[in-house]
Amino acid sequence: MGFTTPCFILKNTLQLREKLEGLGYRIGNKYCIDNNFLATDNNEMFGIEEPYLPEECNGYIHCGFNEELFLAIAALRDDTNYKQWFVCTSDYKEFDGKEWKVGDFDLNTCPDDFDNILPHWRKATVNELIEHFKDKKEQLCVE
């Protein structure tokens, strides 16, 4: 149980690695962590020197330069809902001034029980995250 979707991004910064640490990743190979590009797999982050070509992603989601997409996909887990993106499944009014419509996205920033999902929401899929965060100029790899 844990992280479910390997991915990589065409950048590698200390700030981005710190955000991954905040999600629960650890450095897999400290000798490669400063390479040009950054990837995640299982609970590890690691640097890669050459990016995968979109047609050769080998199970990794190619996030281009899109940091929001990379972090959203890297956050996907099967043991928690924390820091995961959710999609609204039915129109409803949460409170005065806050209404949700089918298809709205929201980031869960509250630690919660994994089994305690609100009835109007479901976890976003990889394809939905790509569509939500995509930059029309980028070519992304989806399997």
Predicted segments, located by residue:
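Charged interaction segments
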Residues: 23, 31-143
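Short, extreme N-terminal segment that most often corresponds to the first beta-strand
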Residues: 1-28, 143
